[in-house]
Amino acid sequence: LHTQWPGTGKPRDPFFDQFYASQVQLMVDPVKTQDYAQKALSALLDRIGPAILLTHSQSGTFGFLVADKRPDLVKGVVTVEGGGMPRGFTPVGPPRWFEDAPPPDVTWGITSIPLTYSPTVAEARQLTFVRESMPAPGTLVRCWVQASPARQLPNLQRMPHLLVVGEASAASSTNHCVSRYLTQAGVRNTWVNLGDVGIHGNGHMMMLEKNSLEIAAFLAGWLVDNVEKGRRTTS
């Protein structure tokens, strides 16, 4: 259950109204959005130096793209409730639970603009995706992955990745497919449903919810173990 949102979650509730007032328009073209974000954030890293990337929702793909463009400057990537699948899913309920959403016009796997693959990919149509024959244990969807042999993502292999979803979020049913795509491409990553680590009741906007400090502590602990200590181990 979604129990951590403050207030009623309905209009005229002060928490909801404050949240709603913060919302702004977004660009609906993922190609332009991702291109602008990759260029701007890469330029920022060039100025400030090495960093850990923390992304959420629509910006989830930005972390992958910046890490791909500046692998020497990205020490780790934390993707909270992020997108990035070759194909999405539409919930339909039992017994099928999910159907495939319409395919995107262009996909580079987990992004809408080019990533660095090995062997090299010059055009998105060179990538071939297949649906897994069975859902992963404990899940209800058959993920879309690369046809075998899978091309690798060498730049993303150079840093650890954490993918996090809330227990009560819609992403908890499908977001593991991003992790499976990364794993197939040789990228070390950890996928966590917060409910599985004892953090319960969160939805998509977990950073605004009542237990957000508990979530922040979990993320910080993972970064210490996998970025700070990992760097010491490999140095």
Regions found by a protein language model. Name each.
Residues T183-G201:
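Catalytic histidine neighborhood in serine/cysteine hydrolases
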Residues P86, E167-S173:
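Acidic catalytic loop of the alpha/beta-hydrolase fold
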